[in-house]
């Protein structure tokens, strides 16, 4: 699955964890047209944001 396949607000990780900690979980945000990337933030830190390309592989099959 890739970032562009997720809906806004869905949780994901960048590595395949079975039971990730709060620091390893991201939330998909809005698409930024000027940078052509998706803004994603950490679940545990609302001021942290990271821009990811739409074809970045993410993992959603985990227990949180």
Regions found by a protein language model. Name each.
Residues 44-64:
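Intrinsically disordered, low-complexity, charged/polar segments
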Residues 34-42:
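Short, solvent-exposed secondary-structure boundary/capping segments
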Residues 1-7:
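Mixed-charge, Lys/Arg-rich low-complexity intrinsically disordered regions
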Residues 9-11:
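A broad helix-preferring feature
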Residues 20-33:
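Short beta-strand-centered aromatic/proline hotspots
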């Amino acid at each position: 699955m890739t970032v562009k396949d997720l809906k806004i607000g869905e949780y994901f990780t960048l590595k395949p964890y079975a039971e990730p900690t709060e620091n390893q979980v991201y939330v998909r945000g809005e698409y930024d047209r000027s940078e052509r990337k998706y803004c994603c933030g950490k679940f545990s830190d609302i001021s942290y944001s990271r821009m990811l390309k739409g074809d970045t592989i993410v993992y959603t099959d985990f227990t949180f």
